[in-house]
């Protein structure tokens, strides 16, 4: 299968850099899969799973909001955070989920509501990734 160069970058680190056969992430329009020779485009990246097929193996991760620049021979994903399932503290993710759910039960401003929804989505994506690992 044809490959392309993939970089997944966060403000803290170069999360992934190398050849990939496929990358799948959640975008604002739903799940997006990219193969080599994809038409050039820019896409928003939403909170959720990131799956990379590199050297015939699938690598699972969780990313938060960001952007993907897609070119025929290269994809660059810039995201606030990216984590492998083994890096996720399950207890911390459960506590974050509970806090976000409690905040959503209160009367909130529109901004606070959106922040709480994002926090809940992030916590749920992190927990989902750890559940898939087991």
Curated annotation (Swiss-Prot):
It is a peripheral membrane protein. Keywords: ATP synthesis, Cell membrane, CF(1), Hydrogen ion transport, Ion transport, Membrane, Transport. Pfam families: ATP-synt_DE, ATP-synt_DE_N. Its main location: membrane. This is ATP synthase epsilon chain. CDD domains: F1-ATPase_delta (cd12152). InterPro entries: ATP_F1_dsu/esu_C_sf (IPR036794), ATP_synth_F1_dsu/esu (IPR001469), ATP_synth_F1_dsu/esu_N (IPR020546), ATP_synth_F1_esu_C (IPR020547), ATPsynth_dsu/esu_N (IPR036771).
């Amino acid at each position: 299968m044809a490959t392309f160069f993939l970089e997944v970058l966060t403000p803290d680190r170069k999360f992934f850099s190398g050849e990939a056969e496929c990358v799948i992430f959640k975008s604002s329009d739903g799940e997006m899969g990219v193969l080599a020779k994809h038409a050039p485009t820019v896409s928003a990246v939403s909170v959720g799973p990131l799956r990379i097929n590199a050297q015939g193996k699938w690598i699972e991760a969780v990313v938060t909001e960001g952007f993907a620049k897609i070119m025929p021979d290269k994809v660059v994903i810039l995201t606030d955070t990216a984590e492998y399932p083994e890096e996720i503290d399950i207890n911390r993710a459960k506590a974050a989920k509970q806090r976000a759910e409690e905040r959503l039960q209160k009367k909130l401003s529109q901004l606070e509501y959106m922040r709480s929804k994002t926090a809940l989505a992030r916590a749920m994506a992190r927990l989902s990734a750890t559940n898939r690992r087991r």
